[in-house]
Amino acid sequence: MAKINWNNERRKLKDLQPWSRNPRQINKAQAARLAESFNEFGQVETIAIGPTNEVYNGHQRLGVLLAKYGGEHEVEVRVASEPLTEKQREKLTVYLHKGAAGEWDFDVLANEFELDELLDWGFEKRDLDIDLWQPEGEASDDAPV
């Protein structure tokens, strides 16, 4: 199979067709944070689609944008030069969302970022080792009494 090329184009939101087998989910709090990021930064990441408008990546962005702007709103999308097979689609989904692009440096997060802001911006307490963030001598809320 030849290398797939991706081109930037514009599409109406109503024309984009979500993948019924998309394994990614978003809860209300995450959707609200995503909407807040659109308000502050605009649509930084595009939605990736196939030649016939099937969504490969960006289902959560699509849902939030539809709720915010409606189906007639146009967005920039990345269009594959050819359709992906189901196996390629599964593989792409995992690659894009499960660490293929790197991991967090928790030392940098702990020393250079504010915990409250990280939690506001989308980290969950379970994602962070909260004990690392406690000043010396201060007990964690989760510590036994």
Stretches with model-predicted labels:
Residues M1-V145:
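Aromatic/glycine/proline-enriched transmembrane-helix motif characteristic
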